[in-house]
């Protein structure tokens, strides 16, 4: 998704291993989407969604509305042991283009807007009750 929005060669993320060796991932083509973008996030926004949010925010391609994201920014591998059991290890950590840690920290929104408690655990929130969506619409005008 980042390839469709970011400029060619914009940094999407850094992967850093335990020896602080960095790999950089950059956008590979020119964007095909060139319009204001407002991303909604909450505490359930995790992993690759956080990477996208961080990439768009740091490259000034989107504003983020909602609450802080979950904070899962690591690469994990499952090693199979001789007895058939497994061991999950963390091999690398993701950083945003500005080298901001994601893991156990999350991505902060540009505009913090909490959902009312009455709709927090509802699968489908009516538009009129969705304070985050209402703020995004207001910002888009």
Spans of features found by a protein language model:
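Conserved P-loop NTPase
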Residues: 76-79, 87-119
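Beta-strand-rich C-terminal secretin pore/gate domain
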Residues: 60, 73, 81-82, 109, ...
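Short beta-strands and strand-coil junctions in structured, solvent-facing domains, enriched
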Residues: 46-47, 84, 96-97, 122
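Extracytoplasmic/secreted envelope proteins and their assembly/folding machinery
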Residues: 2, 6, 34-37, 49-53, ...
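C-terminal recognition in membrane/secretory proteostasis and scaffolding
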Residues: 15, 58, 80, 114-141
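Gly/Ser/Thr-rich loop/hinge elements
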Residues: 1-47, 74-79, 95
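Short, well-structured beta-strand/strand-turn elements
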Residues: 46, 59-72
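Envelope-exposed proteins and targeting segments
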Residues: 33-36, 60, 74, 85, ...
């Amino acid at each position: 998704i980042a390839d469709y929005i970011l400029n060619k060669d914009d940094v999407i993320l850094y992967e850093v291993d335990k020896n602080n060796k960095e790999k950089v991932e950059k956008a590979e083509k020119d964007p095909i989407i060139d319009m204001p973008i407002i991303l909604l996030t909450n505490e359930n926004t995790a992993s690759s969604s956080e990477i996208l949010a961080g990439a768009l925010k740091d490259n000034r391609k989107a504003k983020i509305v909602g609450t802080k994201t979950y904070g899962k920014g690591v690469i994990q591998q499952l090693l199979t042991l001789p007895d058939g059991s497994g061991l999950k290890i963390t091999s690398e950590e993701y950083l945003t283009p500005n080298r901001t840690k994601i893991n156990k920290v999350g991505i902060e929104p540009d505009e913090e807007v909490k959902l009312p408690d009455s709709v927090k655990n509802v699968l489908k929130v009516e538009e009129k009750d969705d304070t985050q969506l209402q703020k995004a619409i207001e910002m888009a005008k």
